[in-house]
Amino acid sequence: MNLPTLWTWILPPIAGAIIGYFTNDVAIKMLFRPYKAIYIGKRPLPFTPGLIPRNQDRLAVRVSDTIMGSLLTPEELQKLAKRLLDTERVQGAILWLLQLALKQIKGDRQAKTAEILAAILHDLFGESLARLLKVLARRQDFLEKQINQIFDRLVLEFSLSEQQARQFSDWLLETVLPADVIRLALIDFLTDRNIQVIDEGFREKTSGTYWVVANLFGLRNALARLRTFCLDEKDLANTRIKELLLSLEMRNRLKNWLQSISLQNLPISTVRQLRKTTRDTVRIYIQESGEQFLQDFGQTIDWDQIANLIINRLQSSVSMTTSLGVISQELALILERYLEEDLEKLVAQIIPILNIDQVIRDRVNATSPADLENAIQGIVKQELQGIVNLGGILGLLVGLMQTIILIAQNPG
């Protein structure tokens, strides 16, 4: 067997294997090369640029349609949204936001935060709440339950303790009704006319032994002497009045009387009317003066100081820090219940807003042919190497078949 004949048999398998192995790489390069059109004069050469660069716009549309039609369908987007909006993930995100907000309050923005909070509080209590109360006060049942509850628990059940009654009676006898005030009241009361009226009434309405005393002696002289005594002997009169109050145990009597005062002793109809009067008085006052009262009251408050106190309290509050987890969990559960009902509608509304298909087209069109080629070559080398090897094997088999045919045709 001579060398040319041997080469005739060996060359087809080798050539077939080489061609089959490198066909994919050559085919890919032929799809992209050249990247730009080559001109002879003003006429471009045929098949320039490559197939993909020449039809890159149409390729972008096809890629976008394929992805949106097969991969990113509304159902898949819903599943993706459910995975992304898992309760634990949402809770973690909300907790992070709350902690970030708390850190912002603790940081350099405290003054700004306090200023904003002060403005909110001033508007809420000075303006918004005042207008709201004025509108609500027009209703006949405005604060009815609340006022009735306050009346029943505080006013109706109110009674003085023994110590309070003692202090109150001491205050009455020492400040409101001291001996000197009682003496002056007696002087003012015992005018000539009042003395005459008392004496005549005593004479006319008594009978028996008292009638004899009243008509023989009367009360005129006794009352006149009492008035003169109070006028002339001030200190002595005050001393006698104090002794009289002490002898009559007025302090204890007054204390016992104060302790016995209770609205529960009144008739039920009177209590009901008193409750209704209290409720109507409060409602009418709020209707007429409530708005102005709240506005004036709001002007007297240092809202900046209040805001700073609130922020400082939040900063040092352990319960505030520990409650962030509970708050984030509750908010996450609320969001989960909402998404269970309306996730399909939300996804249908979000897809046109995101405009994913146009984003895909823009990205494909913005990618240079060289980058596309490198990306496809990388995929082929990393993920489709088996196809490349298979091409080499098929080329080898085709070459062997050709060698067999040649041997069969030339047996000698």
UniProtKB/Swiss-Prot annotation:
One of its GO terms (cellular component) is plasma membrane. InterPro entries: DUF445, UCP032178. It comes from the Bacteria. It holds the Pfam family DUF445. Keywords: Cell inner membrane, Cell membrane, Membrane, Transmembrane, Transmembrane helix. It is found in: Cell inner membrane. It is a multi-pass membrane protein. The chain crosses the membrane at residues 3-23, 387-407. Belongs to the UPF0754 family. PANTHER family: UPF0754 MEMBRANE PROTEIN YHEB. This is UPF0754 membrane protein MAE_37850. The lineage of its organism: Bacteria, Bacillati, Cyanobacteriota, Cyanophyceae, Oscillatoriophycideae.
